[in-house]
């Protein structure tokens, strides 16, 4: 049994959970090629459809459906030139824990786009993981499958809670990742101490 099936998922179920846009156009188009409210209402309809979808009860893994506020906020952050499928690529997102990222990378199917962040982003902000995006075609909103080791999940959560949307430079997260790997913190209390130290150094 594969990693997906162990958690109650399968390509077939993901297809059933994929929401087809009602706009009649490929979601590869950029945000500014759609009328703003029509696109937002389409994305919000996807979230509402997922909210009441009984198929999610079959899934034995953490998931979250993006809120209306988050959908609108992401539109504003990404407008005008980002494709819709890269903006609203996580209206439905599943979170997996894995022992090794090779487990996630082995899930190579035509419908999956793999984004390997296990060694960091192009501009490293400390985050580590592997993201898979499931999409039957370009007229459906993608579903995000986020894989992290337990070790990385802990730091990712702290980075999200303390740095996300606060406009700190990526170097802050990168410095925290280095300190984490050096063993300088392993609890929320020691994380906060190291964060304060890193921020004070940035201000000098």
Residue ranges of model-derived segments:
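Hydrophobic alpha-helical segments with strong N-terminal bias
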Residues: 9, 77-79, 115
């Amino acid at each position: 049994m594969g990693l997906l099936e162990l958690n109650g998922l399968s390509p077939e179920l993901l297809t059933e959970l994929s929401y087809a846009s009602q706009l009649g156009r490929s979601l590869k188009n950029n945000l500014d090629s759609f009328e703003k409210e029509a696109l937002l209402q389409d994305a919000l309809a996807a979230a509402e459809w997922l909210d009441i979808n009984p198929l999610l009860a079959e899934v034995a893994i953490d998931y979250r459906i993006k809120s209306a506020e988050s959908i609108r906020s992401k539109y504003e952050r990404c407008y005008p030139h980002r494709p819709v499928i890269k903006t609203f690529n996580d209206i439905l997102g599943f979170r997996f824990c894995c022992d090794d990222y090779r487990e996630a990378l082995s899930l190579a199917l035509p419908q999956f786009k793999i984004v390997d962040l296990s060694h960091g982003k192009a501009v490293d902000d400390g985050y580590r993981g592997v993201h898979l995006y499931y999409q039957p075609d370009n007229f459906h909103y993608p579903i995000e499958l986020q894989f992290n080791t337990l070790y990385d999940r802990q730091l990712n959560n702290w980075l999200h809670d303390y740095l996300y949307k606060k406009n700190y430079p990526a170097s802050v997260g990168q410095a925290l990742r280095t300190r984490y790997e050096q063993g300088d913190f392993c609890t929320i209390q020691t994380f906060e101490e190291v964060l304060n130290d890193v921020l004070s150094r940035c201000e000098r």
